[in-house]
Amino acid sequence: MESPSCIQDEPFPHPLEPEPSAPAQPGATKPGDKRFRLWYVGGSCLDRRTTLPMLPWLMAEIRRRSQKPDAGGCGAPAAREVILVLSAPFLRCVPAPGAGVGGGAGSGAVQPNTGVFIFEHKAQHISRFIHNSHDLTYFAYLIKAQPDDPESQMACHVFRATDPNQVPDVISSIRQLSKAAMKEDSKPSKDNEDAFYNSQKFEVLYCGRVIVTHKKAPSSLIDDCKDKFSLHEQQRLKLQGERGGDPGDEMGVLEVESPVSPDDSLPEKADGTVNSPRALPSLASLPALASQPALASSRVCFPERILEDCGFDEQQEFRSRCSSVTGVMQKKVHENNQKTQPRRRHASAPSHVQPSDSEKNRTMLFQVGRFEINLISPDTKSVVLEKNFKDISSCSQGIKHVDHFGFICRESPEPGLSQYICYVFQCANESLVDEVMLTLKQAFSTAAALQSAKTQIKLCETCPMHSLHKLCERIEGLYPPRAKLVIQRHLSSLTDNEQADIFERVQKMKPISDQEENELVILHLRQLCEAKQRTHVHIGEGPAIISNSTIPENVTSGGRFKLDVLKNKAKRSLTSSLENIFSRGANRMRGRLGSMDSFERANSLASEKDFSPGDSPPGTPPASPLSSAWHAFPEEDSDSPQFRRRAHTFSHPPSSSRRKLNLQDGKAHGLRSPLLRQSSSEQCSIVPSARRMYKESNSSCSLPSLHTSFSAPSFTAPSFLKSFYQNSGRLSPQYENEIRQDTASESSDGEGRKRTSSTCSNESLNAGGTPVTPRRVSWRQRIFLRVASPVNKSPSAMQQQKDGLDRTELLPLSPLSPTMEEEPLIIFLSGDEDTEKVEEKKKSKELKSLWKKAIHQQILLLRMEKENQKLEEARRDELQSRKVKLDYEEVGTCQKEILIAWDKKLLNCRTKIRCDMEDIHTSLKEGVPKSRRGEIWQFLALQYRLRHRLPNKHQPPDTSYKELLKQLTAQQHAILVDLGRTFPTHPYFSVQLGAGQLSLFNLLKAYSLLDKEVGYCQGISFVAGVLLLHMSEEQAFEMLKFLMYDLGFRKQYRPDMMSLQIQMYQLSRLLHDYHRELYNHLEENEISPSLYAAPWFLTLFASQFPLGFVARVFDIIFLQGTEVIFKVALSLLSSQEALIMECENFENIVEFLKSTLPDMNTTEMEKIITQVFEMDISKQLHAYEVEYHVLQDELLESSYACEDNESLEKLERANNQLKRQNMDLLEKLQVAHAKIQALESNLETLLTRETKMKALIRTLEQDKMAYQKTVEQIRKLLPADALANCELLLKDLTHPTNDKAKAGNKP
């Protein structure tokens, strides 16, 4: 048979010329299709509980059935020769011409009829490829039987190639076809647009996050979080002020270190209290990002991690979204995430509150999809947060801060550890928050309804299919003899009848190798597990939920299976105790074998005894082969409490397929478990750090290291030890000869067998191929090692160990345990002189320092290489982005002389020198290079500003672009809706919420915040889009301000649209004066300019015309201003006047103006641009504007002249009534004035009398004071008796006077 190959653009098979004038057939291959001659082995539908580890065995079963069709009574057909035709987007399996079933190659001269095929399906529906490690010519792929039905089963198709080198070619070709088909499907379609518009998007301001203890939020949680964020911001500003506002100092002040004690990292409850250590004991091991701020580090990795102090977990993966961000952006984000900064602790920074950085752009797009929430950063053009609805427990809105809301979700900073995080956001106003909450509620309800409709695959710990999954995981990558041992251990957990049944079936098929026997056993095990799974009762499910017809069978089978589980546990405990006894025999046997290599393998096999098939299932069992979880092998982790995971310090990270060979507990093996110090990868030597040493029988080699890792494929254990612990623990007879051969070879060769390690090279191990491990030696053994070890060691190996190992002192001549770190081989190599030891120690220190220096230099080199790669990738991305932006056909050609002229002019742009406008006009007329168009626009804007100074009252607000992006806009809904409508076919803007749309959102949002009067109006998005295609965001923002304010385009976007009405009148007058027939034709059909010309003015022709033409129009607009639009419109209408006149009705004319008119060729566009340069209508436009205002005033005046008589009479009657009212009011006013005058005269009289009385009172007071002085003097002169008599006399005189007065008052 001919060697397989991929023949392109030629018919298959064999390189023959295609038949001339072959008739076209429905299924005929097209030029460019790829065809491969293969053998179709067969296919099979998979059980929904089939996982990835089971697939190789299923593939082997299909292959075996094709080789032996009658085996197992399956009656499967033999393999047939086929042609795999890759015709986009289909993958078609066609029978090979002239080849019978199971036959050889047929006639190669026959053209294959691709219209008749065995099966076909779309390439993008293929989900996974499977290789056969035992036979590289076999491969398979998985595909859904019904791609449109998510509940459909998976199908597996197996093929065989005649050459192993053909398999990668076939797979890569299918993958390329699949990618091309997926890319074609991802193009904007109606369904995609509907999905895009159905997902609600809101602009929010990210405030921060707080760790909470419960998944349900109290009503005041959002307000409490907001208060804490405000407090943190005040502290930050205060500290920044104390440091003098130095950004570098601020960085250090706000950094926080990991808490010293576990209690410091406890999260805070919603009410402000801190949990007790008992509430969350596992939080003590949380990383810094989960418990305290790390503000400086977040400044570096902010694009991926939106949190200022700590971002998301590094293990969190961002899915590649075709509608959100490119893979390059995500790669940059992930690389930025790897950067870290040193941290310092500050006492005032809270450890549980994680606010965002107010100095960064915290505005995000909050997208609510069907099943997830996405937080997209328009600043970094990436998805910074993605949460599924199943991880969100509650949403709430602020009470005091009504414009804030948040949600609580579950996160896992470490495997097996989960916590609840509350993310807080702010919206522009309260109504927007209400809309967000309503959208979330509806989305949750819809997702719950859709999820409940799906059939969930249930798995529990006792599921038969789950036990099969664990077994396939356990034997994956093992050699057939060792896998056979694991399978036999699993079979021992079955009942006696099941074991006997499987044994009989396997023996009937007469396997000839261990691999074939394993495949047969797995086949029957899978059939047994599928049968048991049908009647299996999951844990927690009672028989009450089962129908009456199946209750007896299910109950008995469920009870039987639970009984089997208990039996298995008892068997495992008994087996482990027996194996502990057998292991002692293995220890004695090691002395007889005299080889540490075999002992190491025996220990590695003994470590397999702890692997139990009854491990607990994962929390979320795999639902399908595509989503099946790859769990760590049970061999990788030790359940013993004395072992703990060590840090990897080797030169490359550990792979998931590594195994650790661990010695077991001392009670089981008669050994102690020493604690070993981790060795470095550079020296590749394992130095002991424990004081305990093993006491073993005489051997020429030391024990293997406890924590030496070996990759699974490189493990080569001797065959006689692979069944050492099988059944009774005795060696099987078939391996006795191998034992003798191994013993003889190892006794003759002192080095033994060398094993390759996956973590270090052979030179890093000792001469025997095993790492050095401490053991207890007596003084006799020490003397023996001094004498015997050099015989078995080569000088090179001794010298290598002497140079590479650290020195320790000699063991004391005593059987007691040593008092310091010791190692037998090092002791032997050590000298007796103290001076030699000191020198060697110094030498070891120097080596360590040299190694450290080399490591640091290597790290720096790697970092520099990474930075260079990033810079190179950034340059490539920039070039690619620029290429995508400028992907349009340019109108006109630009000569080399024009490029040189423009380069000279752009130099003046930097120096701000005025240039001759006639020269600029001439150069612009000759052409503009597409690559320098953005710079030329900036140059033209600068020249305009140098000649025209905008008044201060018309100047835009002086706010920077970055500051505007930090704010929230009220125009977000209108902007977000128009993103998908702006240049929907251009590759830069076609990606939904891609880099182009997010840049456009930023630009439109910034201008809406800058110009409060205009805000956002439809049409500005196209103008901004054209600017973004030729320059960066900030430059486009400056040019947009120039167009709006300096050139005056913002007038036509005002809410009253007055300027647009004037422009429509001016265009009508131009048509009336210069193209009267066309004007009359349009008027007869009632077609006003606002019907077809409004988009031309609002979008500057960008919404309907080709980008090359629009770019040339923008060239002239930057030079001449708004009148260019009238010139272009007039030229367009005049050039197509004859065709417009041929349209007879309203519909035809409108269709022509909207569809046919923009579809021009390059020649017509160049002609129009030339006419625009030669046209001058500025005077006419000014005259028409004045005319419009005059007509508007006349219209207002004429409205007053047309008032009728009734209105006049009403006004006269109203006037007479008002006159009478005025007269009455005047009379009342006169009376009031007279009263006021009388009151004023009375007031004057009273004031005069008051003044007189005050003067009289003052006189009387003076007299009183004089009399009082006289009385005092008289009292001093008279004696006391005379004075008393005088007082009595005065009383008497006073009483009669009073009596008379009273009598006078009586009537």
Swiss-Prot record:
Q: Which PROSITE patterns match?
A: PID, TBC_RABGAP
Q: Where is this region: Disordered?
A: 1-30, 237-276, 330-360, 603-684, 732-774
So which residues are the signal peptide here?
A: none
Keyword Transferase among record annotations: no
InterPro entries referenced in this protein's UniProt entry, alphabetically: DUF3350 (IPR021785), PH-like_dom_sf (IPR011993), PTB/PI_dom (IPR006020), Rab-GAP-TBC_dom (IPR000195), Rab-GAP_TBC_sf (IPR035969), Rab_GAP_TBC_domain (IPR050302)
Q: Which residues carry this modification: Phosphoserine?
A: 258, 261, 320, 324, 348, 351, 573, 577, 595, 598, 616, 624, 673, 758, 761, 764
| Pfam families hit by this protein | DUF3350, PID, RabGAP-TBC
Coarse class of the protein's main subcellular location: cytoplasm
Q: Where is the composition biased (Pro residues)?
A: 13-23, 615-624
User: Looking at the UniProt record for this protein, which Gene Ontology cellular component terms does it annotate, in alphabetical order?
Assistant: cytoplasmic vesicle membrane
Residues carrying Phosphothreonine: T575, T620, T649, T770
- In terms of superkingdom, the source organism counts as Eukaryota
Q: Write down which residues bear the modification named N6-acetyllysine.
A: K484
Post-translational modification comment from the UniProt entry? Phosphorylated by AKT1; insulin-induced. Also phosphorylated by AMPK in response to insulin. Insulin-stimulated phosphorylation is required for SLC2A4/GLUT4 translocation. Has no effect on SLC2A4/GLUT4 internalization.
**Annotated ranges, domain PID:** 53-209, 319-475
Asked whether the keyword Mitochondrion is assigned, the reply is no
List the keywords (alphabetical). Answer: Acetylation, Cytoplasm, GTPase activation, Methylation, Phosphoprotein, Repeat
Which residues are recorded as modified (Omega-N-methylarginine)? R584
Q: Name one GO molecular function term.
A: GTPase activator activity
Q: Where in the cell is it found?
A: Cytoplasm
Its biological purpose is as follows: May act as a GTPase-activating protein for RAB2A, RAB8A, RAB10 and RAB14. Promotes insulin-induced glucose transporter SLC2A4/GLUT4 translocation at the plasma membrane, thus increasing glucose uptake.
Task: State the name under which the record lists this protein.
Answer: TBC1 domain family member 4
Question: Lineage of the native species?
Answer: Eukaryota, Metazoa, Chordata, Craniata, Vertebrata
